[in-house]
């Protein structure tokens, strides 16, 4: 066979063979051969040989050399350059290498960190419900890490407890309070409850009373100070009105947090089976502090605090100790000594210390009613605590807080200036939606009570027209922006300064009583809110007398009708006279059909706050006289020109809705007509979304 080779090819084969013998096994002899073979040059046998040199590679990365007749002995140079496309691996071959067997890559399943967290959280929760050990649960959660997933822990904890007995529900609430600030930050608590509200529709499928139970958890979180009251209205705005989550928020606010003595009722709703009730713990803390102030035995006081076994509630010890120091100047030094010692022994953690100071700072306004110098004294205590090393400097009164306080004062000053302009514009335009937009643009919901105080103060010094507008606005704000607490706090501020107001406005006390009573009639406040307001005022003060007067007005005969007309129509006319004028202009419009003339007459009435009467009478006239299109055209034109606002439209429609049963006695199809009017109003944007929602809810109940 060598006769077929040229001298040059023989030499190349010799070199290749020698090189192959010297190479380690990992290097391939045929690759050396290929380096020495001449490049194809067009045709002939060289070209054919080159085309035949095709190498198959195994999955292991090795070239598989084809063998001829299973061998490749001496002189068989096909061993080096020939390939066999049908090469098969033979396990019985002496040269068999298992690494050349074909194999399949199998993808490994990657674990999801969130899934891992949820599994671990479920284990922690189940163990906690078995043992009731708060400290172990907190330690396990800290050890678990992945703090960004803590909202899911809250969702899991509450959702599991919802389907268990009251004991577990109470345990879940206690654990949430324990984890607050120390383990789970406030934003994560909030996010956890958002997840719960968003899942309320799913909970109802398995837990029939899920809305009520979740509402109670929400109320308990507010009472326990782990959720701010402002969370409720903000959550309600973010949720679809038809969702179960929205119902949860409404139930929490109206059924639990608006009741008299709601905090005590909510705290004891599940019986407190897990441990001593919160009220009992508070009483024990008060007893420990009172005894300590008398004896001055720091070690004994620390021992008693430790024996309470409520490390998650030590912020209450801090808060009550500080209140004691503010109330009794002689107690300040021993109280600070006690807190210093408790911090040094790690009895009270840094986060619990900060939380206690924060809670006191938030209640300074209320404390100032009984302790006028509370804010000043607290401002002196904070630097001592920070310099003593037992209050985190981030709390910040010495330096940062001073700057923040100045910024806060500046913000409040600007707010007061801006709202005066906004209120004046409202008195001129009666445009409630525009006022609400302006107030939202200020972005300071924490100052809502201040706005209410300024609104009524300005109205007091004006005519009945503006007083009626102020009451109407207050009702709208309560629907759109203000919480009941905002309104109550605003009236407290008004009544605290009632004596000063009376110096400028002689009848201020009587008119404030009317505003307060009117707020109750308009469902802005509940009657029991008057008791809460009175409890925050100095006994036997002008403010408490005003509240008593308001209460007597509310419970008088025909109080509702009288209070709704308490401002007499605003421009000095009797309400009945105003109604007659409105009836006359509508009848004239019915005869003439002149929309522009009717709008002119409405404008000349000069009673924008009473335009809901125009809406009501127009709708009723449309039903009675089958003048639907004519009356709807008038209302549309009035709305387009800005004569009748959304608020007045809504109020007019509401009044017609409330009187439908009586109307149906004379107009059998009154309800059908009214529904048609509502659809028309909805299409043209006349009425508020809250009104449409109330109609939907009433229909569902019916």
From Swiss-Prot:
Keywords: Cytoplasm, Ethylene signaling pathway, Nucleus, Repeat, Stress response, Translation regulation
Gene Ontology MF terms in the entry: mRNA binding; ribosome binding
Family matches, as Gene3D superfamilies: 1.25.40.180
Matches recorded under InterPro entries: ARM-type_fold, Initiation_fac_eIF4g_MI, PDCD4
GO cellular component, one term: Golgi apparatus
Tissues showing expression: Mostly expressed in vegetative tissues, such as leaves and stems, and, to a lower extent, in roots and reproductive tissues, such as flower buds and flowers. Expressed in seedlings, roots, cauline leaf tips and flowers.
Region called Disordered, residue ranges: 1-100
Primary localization: nucleus
Biased composition range(s): Basic residues: 53-65
Disruption phenotype: Enhanced ethylene response, but altered salt response during seed germination and plant growth leading to an increased tolerance to salt stress. Increased susceptibility to dark and starvation, and to treatment with the TOR inhibitor. Decreased translation activity associated with altered ribosome patterns, especially in the dark and starvation conditions, in which mRNAs distribution is altered and rRNA abnormally degraded. Slightly early flowering time under long-day conditions.
Any single GO BP term: response to salt stress
Biased composition (Basic and acidic residues): 81-91
Nuclear localization signal 1 (motif): residue ranges: 267-274
Function text: Involved in target of rapamycin (TOR)-regulated translation control, especially under energy-deficient conditions. Involved in the regulation of the ethylene-mediated signaling pathway. Involved in salt stress responses. Reduced cotyledons size and early flowering.
PANTHER family tied to this protein: PROGRAMMED CELL DEATH 4 (PTHR12626), PROGRAMMED CELL DEATH PROTEIN 4 (PTHR12626:SF0)
Protein name: MA3 DOMAIN-CONTAINING TRANSLATION REGULATORY FACTOR 3
Gene source species: Arabidopsis thaliana
């Amino acid at each position: 066979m060598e006769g077929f080779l040229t001298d040059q090819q023989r030499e190349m084969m010799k070199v290749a063979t020698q090189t192959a013998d010297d190479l380690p096994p990992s290097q391939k002899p045929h690759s050396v051969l290929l380096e020495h073979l001449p490049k194809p040059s067009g045709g002939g046998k060289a070209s054919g040989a080159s085309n035949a040199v095709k190498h198959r590679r195994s999955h292991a990365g090795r070239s598989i050399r084809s063998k001829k007749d299973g061998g490749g002995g001496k002189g068989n140079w096909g061993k080096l350059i020939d390939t066999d496309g049908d090469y098969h691996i033979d396990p019985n071959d002496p040269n068999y290498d298992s690494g050349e067997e074909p194999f399949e890559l199998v993808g490994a399943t990657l674990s999801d960190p969130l899934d891992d967290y949820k599994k671990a959280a479920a284990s922690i929760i189940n163990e906690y419900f078995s043992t009731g050990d708060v400290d172990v649960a907190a330690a396990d959660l800290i050890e678990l890490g992945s703090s960004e997933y803590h909202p899911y822990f809250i969702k899991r904890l509450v959702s599991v407890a919802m389907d268990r007995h009251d004991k577990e529900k109470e345990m879940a609430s206690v654990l949430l309070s324990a984890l607050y600030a120390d383990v789970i930050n406030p934003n994560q608590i909030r996010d956890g409850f958002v997840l719960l509200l968003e899942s309320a529709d799913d909970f109802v499928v398995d837990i029939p009373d899920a809305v009520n139970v979740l509402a109670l958890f929400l109320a308990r979180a507010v009472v326990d100070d782990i959720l701010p009251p402002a969370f409720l209205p903000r959550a309600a705005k973010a949720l679809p009105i038809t969702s179960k989550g929205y119902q949860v928020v409404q139930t929490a606010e109206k059924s639990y947090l608006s009741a008299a003595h709601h905090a005590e009722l909510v705290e004891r709703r599940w019986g407190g089976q897990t441990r001593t009730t919160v009220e009992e713990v508070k009483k024990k803390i008060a007893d420990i502090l009172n005894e300590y102030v008398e004896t001055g035995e720091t070690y004994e006081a620390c021992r008693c605090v430790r024996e309470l076994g409520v490390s998650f509630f030590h912020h209450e010890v801090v808060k009550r100790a500080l209140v004691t120091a503010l109330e009794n100047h002689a107690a300040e030094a021993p109280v600070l000594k006690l807190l210093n010692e408790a911090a040094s022994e790690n009895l009270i953690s840094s986060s619990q210390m900060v939380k206690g100071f924060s809670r006191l700072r938030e209640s300074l306004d209320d404390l100032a009613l009984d302790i006028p110098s509370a804010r000043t004294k607290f401002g002196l205590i904070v630097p001592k605590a920070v310099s003593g090393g037992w209050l985190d400097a981030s709390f910040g009164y010495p330096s940062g807080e001073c700057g923040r306080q100045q910024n806060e004062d500046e913000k409040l000053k600007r707010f007061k200036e801006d709202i005066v302009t906004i209120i004046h514009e409202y008195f001129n335009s009666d445009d409630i939606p525009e006022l609400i937009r302006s107030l939202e643009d200020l972005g300071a919901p924490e100052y809502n009570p201040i706005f209410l105080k300024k609104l009524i103060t300005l109205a007091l010094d004006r005519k009945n027209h503006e007083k009626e507008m102020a009451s109407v606005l207050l009702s709208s704000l309560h629907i759109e922006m203000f919480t009941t607490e905002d309104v109550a706090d605003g009236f407290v501020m008004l009544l605290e300064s009632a004596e000063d107001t009376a110096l400028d406005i002689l009848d201020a006390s009587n008119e404030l009583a009317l505003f307060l009573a009117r707020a109750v009639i308009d469902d802005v406040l509940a009657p029991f809110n008057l008791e809460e307001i009175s409890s925050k005022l100095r006994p036997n003060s002008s403010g408490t007398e005003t509240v008593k007067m308001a209460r007597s007005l509310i419970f008088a005969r025909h109080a509702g009708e009288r209070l709704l007309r308490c401002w007499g129509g605003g421009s000095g006319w009797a309400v009945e006279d105003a109604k007659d004028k409105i009836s006359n202009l509508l009848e004239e419009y019915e005869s003439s059909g002149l929309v522009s003339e009717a709008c002119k007459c409405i404008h000349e009435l000069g009673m924008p706050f009473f335009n809901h009467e125009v809406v009501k009478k127009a709708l009723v006239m449309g039903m009675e006289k089958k003048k639907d299109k004519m009356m709807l055209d008038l209302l549309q034109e009035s709305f387009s020109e800005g004569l009748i606002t959304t608020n007045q439209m809504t109020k007019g429609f509401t009044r017609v809705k409330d009187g439908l049963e009586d109307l149906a006695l004379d107009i059998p199809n009154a309800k059908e007509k009214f529904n048609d009017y509502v659809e028309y109003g909805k299409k043209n944007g006349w009425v508020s979304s809250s009104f449409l929602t109330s109609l939907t809810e009433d229909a569902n109940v019916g």
